[in-house]
């Protein structure tokens, strides 16, 4: 059991010492963050434009 834990620790340490793995992880995190921010902006501006359109239509009918 101790050997299995020891091998897993070695692999984990080797991963963090490889700059290509760190860079790849950073790119994946940035991509996911950008997609989430775009979705957030789409929701926020979609709600803002929908309320403005309903107010304009109500004003035109009067």
Curated annotation (Swiss-Prot):
This is Endoregulin. The keyword Magnesium does not apply. Homooligomer. Can also form heterooligomers with other sarcoplasmic/endoplasmic reticulum calcium ATPase (SERCA) regulators ARLN, PLN, SLN and STRIT1/DWORF. Monomer. Interacts as a monomer with ATP2A2/SERCA2; the interaction results in inhibition of ATP2A2 Ca(2+) affinity. The chain crosses the membrane at residues 25-45. It is a single-pass membrane protein. Inhibits the activity of the calcium ATPases ATP2A2/SERCA2 and ATP2A3/SERCA3 by decreasing their apparent affinity for Ca(2+). The gene is ERLN. GO terms for cellular component: endoplasmic reticulum membrane. Keywords: Endoplasmic reticulum, Membrane, Transmembrane, Transmembrane helix. It is found in: Endoplasmic reticulum membrane. Its main location: endoplasmic reticulum.
